[in-house]
Swiss-Prot record:
Endonuclease that specifically degrades the RNA of RNA-DNA hybrids. This is Ribonuclease HII. It catalyses: Endonucleolytic cleavage to 5'-phosphomonoester. A divalent metal cation binds at residues 18-19, 110. The gene is rnhB. Residues 12-201 form the RNase H type-2 domain. Belongs to the RNase HII family. Transmembrane segments: none annotated. It comes from the Bacteria. NCBIfam families: PRK00015.1-3, PRK00015.1-4. One of its GO terms (biological process) is DNA replication, removal of RNA primer. HAMAP family: RNase_HII_B. Its EC number is 3.1.26.4.
Length: 207
């Protein structure tokens, strides 16, 4: 038994659902849904933010190998800008649950809101620190998104995306003001919108 995590919650085809990437200024919001196998326990599950990158990577592979079912889903930047980040996150969570090849009897959602699902769902505040399946989902989502951000570092150099993963750090905000938004920046987010409008103003003044 792992302290702080209730393994009894996985015994009846319960899916844990979590997201990564609501706060960043760029990139998709990534979600995952996981149904763990009680017969194949995974040691060391915890909130992905509390684990080292090496531990997350190792657990990612183990979760994919041992879970009864898992699905990693997303909502793209265009959807975030069109719907807003909350609704886009709910959509991505919905996609993750619908993508499971086994239908869960219950979906436990990290946080205080649930997406509209075809199965019963319940929110669990700080669930990624309490429910093993949610912890597993948080790891799948974070590793997936972090890998994408590292790849974007090569496509859009100068922003430091591989380091801050899109979050509004001073380095990111300075680069955004200096270089302007990229196609993966969320224009509905205030700092990106301000940088975009500033560049449009400069362009207009040159015409």
């Amino acid at each position: 038994m792992q302290i702080g995590l209730d393994f009894n919650l996985v015994e009846d085809l319960v899916a844990g659902v979590d997201e990564v990437g609501r706060g960043p200024l760029c990139g998709a919001v990534v979600t995952a849904a996981v149904i763990l196998d009680p017969a194949r326990p995974i040691l060391g599950l915890n909130d992905s933010k509390k684990l080292t990158e090496a531990k997350r990577e190792a657990l990612f592979d183990e979760i994919c190998e041992k879970a009864l079912s898992f699905c990693i889903a997303r909502a793209e930047v265009e959807e975030i800008d069109r719907l807003n980040i909350l609704q886009a996150t709910m959509l991505a969570m919905q996609r993750a649950v619908e993508g499971l090849h086994i239908t869960p009897k219950l979906a436990l959602i990290d946080g205080n809101r649930c997406p509209k699902l075809a199965v019963p769902a319940s929110p669990v505040v700080k669930g990624d620190s309490q429910v093993p399946a949610i912890a597993a989902a948080s790891i799948l989502a974070k590793v997936t998104r972090d890998r994408e951000m590292s790849a974007f570092e090569l496509i859009y150099p100068g922003y430091g995306i591989g380091g801050h993963k899109g979050y509004p750090t001073p380095v990111h905000l300075e680069a955004l003001a200096r270089l302007g938004p990229t196609p993966i920046h969320r224009r509905s987010f205030a700092p990106v919108r301000a940088a975009w409008e500033a560049r449009e103003g400069v362009t207009d003044s040159l015409i």
